[in-house]
Amino acid sequence: MQDVDIYKALANHRRLAILSWLKDPKAHFPPQADGNLVEDGVCGLFIAEKLDISQATLSEHMRVLVQAGLVTPKKIKQWIFYKRDEARIQSLKDGLISGL
């Protein structure tokens, strides 16, 4: 993915909120029956509820974030869990700083 596509992924208030919440999932989401908030990520259902959007709309936002390499999905049972790709995000930060 080109840098401009990554910046487009970040140019949405909902996706920025998702990334912010996923940085500290225990502070923003309730405990889950399946999956550890920190190790496995947050169930998409909880993210959709917090944003007050449909699961279909959330799926599109998460598709953009996954394609940008900012989050990683993990399937547990019938649920998809998402967490930040901290190494990729740090690499983007470093690239932005050195590129300016």
Enumerate the predicted regions with their spans.
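Short, Lys/Arg-enriched N-terminal segment that forms or immediately precedes the first helix
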Residues: M1-Y7
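Short, compact, well-ordered microdomains
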Residues: I76, A87-Q90
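Short, Lys/Arg-rich amphipathic alpha-helical interaction segments
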Residues: I89-L100
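Alpha-helical residues within the helix-turn-helix
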Residues: E49, E60, V66-Q67
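N-terminal helix-turn-helix DNA-binding core of bacterial DNA-binding proteins
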Residues: K8, R14-S54, I80-A87
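Beta-hairpin "wing" of winged helix-turn-helix
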Residues: P31, Q67-I76, K83
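Histidine-centered active-site/metal-ligand motif
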Residues: N12, H61
